[in-house]
């Protein structure tokens, strides 16, 4: 004889937590990129555990991409130019939702069209394992409102300027930005190692 299932709701997981609590947790991923556990962002970062992040490059209506320069006191990549926005994907959040949230929190940009260019696992310079989804956002006519606690400068660059920096002055750029340029995810590759034809 089969037991009758209980009508009582079982509180069996952290996803039953209030939304404001979930926004402080990240999903740790197993080897196939599937979430298996929740933890705080601080714990995941400290231990270098595999988690998801988003990288976003914002383009204006002229096709130029916005870059931000990290502060000299930034814990990672101090003083280097980086993608427009970067951030963690919180528990229960899609990468698209995280990209929209980060664009608004870091640059004050809302409603920009997002296009996911790809997702790749990598290890950052601190040894943290990450699954990064790269997005192009825009074109947007809104001027980014830089968060001065995160960056000391911001600028729009065109394809030739960005590819010139990535080819000749890599020491000024984050590895993630160089990777995105070389992959042709910001501007299409037309010839050469990653230069426009």
Please report, for each region that a protein language model flagged, where it lies by residue.
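Conserved Nudix-box catalytic region and its N-terminal flanking loop in Nudix hydrolases
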Residues: 43-60, 64-101
